[in-house]
């Protein structure tokens, strides 16, 4: 199941991210995937039976980049404690790696100020 983040609010030291779908029973796996075809990052969640993916589309990337030190809470109930570590790992892997596609890599490098 793909759960799209469609709203992000900032309050104090927290990034509140919202999806229209319920996340009840889901916990974080601590793994970030890349969907380079659709310009998105997918953060893996698990309910014990199947995986779900929180989808952060390109339009959310600037907010993520500008708030890399803030906590991330989904639908006011699930804190993603490993999100920033996973995102940093993925960004390090994408840097200069055209296996993801030149345009995707260029967009990520520009948005996240990767040199």
UniProtKB/Swiss-Prot annotation:
HAMAP family: UPF0738 (MF_01861). Belongs to the UPF0738 family. This is UPF0738 protein SAB0871.
């Amino acid at each position: 199941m793909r759960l799209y983040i469609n709203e992000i609010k900032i309050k104090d030291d927290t990034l509140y991210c919202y999806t229209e779908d319920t996340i009840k029973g889901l916990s974080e796996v601590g793994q970030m995937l890349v969907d380079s075809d659709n310009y998105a990052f997918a953060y893996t969640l698990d309910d014990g039976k199947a995986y779900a993916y929180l989808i952060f589309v390109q339009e959310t990337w600037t907010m993520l980049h500008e708030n890399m030190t803030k906590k991330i809470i989904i639908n006011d109930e699930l804190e993603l404690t490993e999100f920033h570590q996973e995102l940093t790992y993925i960004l390090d892997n994408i840097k200069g790696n055209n296996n993801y596609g030149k345009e995707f890599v260029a967009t990520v490098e520009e948005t996240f100020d990767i040199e």
